[in-house]
Protein backbone atom coordinates (compact mmCIF):
# COMPACT_ATOMS: atom_id res chain seq x y z
CA UNK A 1 0.00 0.00 0.00
CA UNK A 2 1.07 3.56 -0.64
CA UNK A 3 0.94 6.87 1.13
CA UNK A 4 -1.29 9.72 0.00
CA UNK A 5 -0.53 13.34 0.72
CA UNK A 6 -3.85 15.14 0.56
CA UNK A 7 -4.16 18.87 1.14
CA UNK A 8 -6.19 22.02 0.69
CA UNK A 9 -4.31 25.29 0.21
CA UNK A 10 -5.65 28.79 -0.37
CA UNK A 11 -2.49 30.94 -0.30
CA UNK A 12 0.07 28.25 -1.14
CA UNK A 13 1.61 27.70 2.30
CA UNK A 14 -0.09 24.36 2.89
CA UNK A 15 0.84 23.28 -0.63
CA UNK A 16 4.47 24.16 0.09
CA UNK A 17 4.55 21.87 3.12
CA UNK A 18 2.64 19.11 1.29
CA UNK A 19 5.18 19.18 -1.53
CA UNK A 20 8.03 19.06 0.98
CA UNK A 21 6.49 15.98 2.60
CA UNK A 22 5.94 14.40 -0.82
CA UNK A 23 9.59 14.96 -1.76
CA UNK A 24 10.66 13.22 1.46
CA UNK A 25 8.32 10.22 1.56
CA UNK A 26 7.04 9.76 -1.99
CA UNK A 27 3.60 8.30 -2.59
CA UNK A 28 0.86 10.24 -4.31
CA UNK A 29 -0.11 13.85 -3.77
CA UNK A 30 -3.60 15.26 -4.42
CA UNK A 31 -4.97 18.75 -3.88
CA UNK A 32 -8.48 19.31 -2.53
CA UNK A 33 -10.14 22.11 -4.52
CA UNK A 34 -13.50 23.83 -4.30
CA UNK A 35 -15.78 24.08 -7.33
CA UNK A 36 -16.26 27.78 -6.64
CA UNK A 37 -12.86 29.32 -5.90
CA UNK A 38 -12.37 31.91 -3.20
CA UNK A 39 -11.90 35.31 -4.83
CA UNK A 40 -11.42 38.90 -3.80
CA UNK A 41 -8.94 40.46 -1.44
CA UNK A 42 -7.37 38.53 1.40
CA UNK A 43 -9.64 40.39 3.83
CA UNK A 44 -12.70 39.43 1.75
CA UNK A 45 -11.72 35.76 1.87
CA UNK A 46 -11.02 35.95 5.62
CA UNK A 47 -14.51 37.38 6.19
CA UNK A 48 -16.09 34.74 3.95
CA UNK A 49 -14.12 32.02 5.74
CA UNK A 50 -15.30 33.24 9.12
CA UNK A 51 -18.94 33.10 7.98
CA UNK A 52 -18.49 29.63 6.50
CA UNK A 53 -16.80 28.22 9.60
CA UNK A 54 -19.39 29.68 11.95
CA UNK A 55 -22.26 28.40 9.77
CA UNK A 56 -20.72 24.94 9.28
CA UNK A 57 -20.78 25.49 5.51
CA UNK A 58 -19.31 22.68 3.40
CA UNK A 59 -18.30 23.87 -0.08
CA UNK A 60 -18.76 21.64 -3.10
CA UNK A 61 -15.45 20.06 -4.06
CA UNK A 62 -14.02 19.38 -7.48
CA UNK A 63 -13.96 15.69 -8.38
CA UNK A 64 -10.73 13.92 -7.50
CA UNK A 65 -9.51 10.80 -9.21
CA UNK A 66 -8.40 8.89 -6.12
CA UNK A 67 -9.26 5.50 -4.71
CA UNK A 68 -8.72 5.79 -0.97
CA UNK A 69 -8.73 2.00 -0.59
CA UNK A 70 -5.28 1.97 -2.23
CA UNK A 71 -3.73 3.84 0.70
CA UNK A 72 -3.07 2.87 4.28
CA UNK A 73 -1.38 6.14 5.24
CA UNK A 74 -2.90 9.57 4.61
CA UNK A 75 -0.96 12.76 5.27
CA UNK A 76 -3.60 15.48 5.48
CA UNK A 77 -2.83 19.18 5.27
CA UNK A 78 -5.12 22.12 5.95
CA UNK A 79 -4.76 25.80 6.61
CA UNK A 80 -6.26 27.05 9.86
CA UNK A 81 -9.41 29.09 9.25
CA UNK A 82 -10.90 30.61 12.37
CA UNK A 83 -9.13 28.17 14.69
CA UNK A 84 -10.23 25.03 12.84
CA UNK A 85 -9.67 23.28 9.52
CA UNK A 86 -10.69 25.04 6.32
CA UNK A 87 -14.25 24.35 5.12
CA UNK A 88 -12.87 22.51 2.06
CA UNK A 89 -10.94 20.13 4.32
CA UNK A 90 -14.00 19.59 6.50
CA UNK A 91 -16.10 18.91 3.38
CA UNK A 92 -13.63 16.26 2.21
CA UNK A 93 -13.46 14.56 5.61
CA UNK A 94 -17.25 14.63 5.98
CA UNK A 95 -17.68 12.95 2.59
CA UNK A 96 -14.94 10.31 2.91
CA UNK A 97 -14.43 7.56 5.46
CA UNK A 98 -10.81 7.31 6.59
CA UNK A 99 -11.58 4.58 9.11
CA UNK A 100 -8.81 1.98 9.25
CA UNK A 101 -6.26 4.43 7.84
CA UNK A 102 -3.29 5.97 9.61
CA UNK A 103 -3.67 9.75 9.36
CA UNK A 104 -0.89 12.28 9.89
CA UNK A 105 -2.47 15.75 10.01
CA UNK A 106 -0.64 19.02 9.60
CA UNK A 107 -1.99 22.54 9.77
CA UNK A 108 -0.53 25.80 8.54
CA UNK A 109 -1.38 29.06 10.22
CA UNK A 110 -0.41 32.66 10.57
CA UNK A 111 -1.35 32.98 14.19
CA UNK A 112 -2.81 30.24 16.30
CA UNK A 113 -3.56 26.57 15.68
CA UNK A 114 -6.73 26.63 17.76
CA UNK A 115 -8.58 23.30 17.79
CA UNK A 116 -7.66 22.39 14.20
CA UNK A 117 -5.84 19.12 14.84
CA UNK A 118 -8.47 17.98 17.37
CA UNK A 119 -11.23 18.77 14.88
CA UNK A 120 -9.45 16.84 12.12
CA UNK A 121 -9.12 13.84 14.44
CA UNK A 122 -12.83 14.03 15.30
CA UNK A 123 -13.66 14.03 11.56
CA UNK A 124 -11.69 10.79 11.09
CA UNK A 125 -13.61 8.27 13.21
CA UNK A 126 -12.01 4.84 13.21
CA UNK A 127 -8.70 6.18 11.89
CA UNK A 128 -5.43 6.01 13.78
CA UNK A 129 -4.74 9.75 13.92
CA UNK A 130 -1.13 10.44 14.82
CA UNK A 131 0.16 13.59 16.54
CA UNK A 132 -0.13 16.47 14.13
CA UNK A 133 2.24 19.17 13.00
CA UNK A 134 1.59 22.87 13.63
CA UNK A 135 3.35 24.89 10.91
CA UNK A 136 3.53 28.62 11.51
CA UNK A 137 3.96 31.15 8.72
CA UNK A 138 4.29 34.92 8.82
CA UNK A 139 2.60 35.69 5.50
CA UNK A 140 4.69 33.49 3.16
CA UNK A 141 7.71 33.24 5.47
CA UNK A 142 8.04 29.90 7.25
CA UNK A 143 8.54 30.40 11.00
CA UNK A 144 8.48 26.78 12.18
CA UNK A 145 12.07 25.48 12.36
CA UNK A 146 13.06 23.11 9.55
CA UNK A 147 14.27 20.53 12.07
CA UNK A 148 10.79 20.41 13.65
CA UNK A 149 9.18 19.75 10.28
CA UNK A 150 11.83 17.22 9.24
CA UNK A 151 11.51 15.31 12.54
CA UNK A 152 7.72 15.06 12.07
CA UNK A 153 8.11 13.90 8.47
CA UNK A 154 10.65 11.26 9.54
CA UNK A 155 8.12 9.83 12.01
CA UNK A 156 5.67 9.04 9.20
CA UNK A 157 7.52 5.91 8.18
CA UNK A 158 9.29 4.98 11.42
Report the location of each language-model feature.
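Structural beta-sheet core signal
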Residues: 5, 76, 105-107, 131
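N-terminal beta1-alpha1-beta2 submodule of the flavodoxin-like/Rossmannoid cofactor-binding fold
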Residues: 1-76, 83-85, 90, 94, ...
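Short, conserved loop/helix-junction motifs that constitute active-site signature segments
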Residues: 94-100, 123-125
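Conserved beta-strand segments of alpha/beta enzyme cores
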Residues: 28, 128-131
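Glycine-rich phosphate/pyrophosphate-binding loop and the adjoining helix
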Residues: 130-158
Amino acid sequence: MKSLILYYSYRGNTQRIAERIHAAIGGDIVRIDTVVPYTGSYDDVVAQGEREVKQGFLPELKAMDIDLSRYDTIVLGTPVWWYTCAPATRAFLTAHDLGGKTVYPFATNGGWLGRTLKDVAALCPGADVKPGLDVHFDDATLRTPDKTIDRWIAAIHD
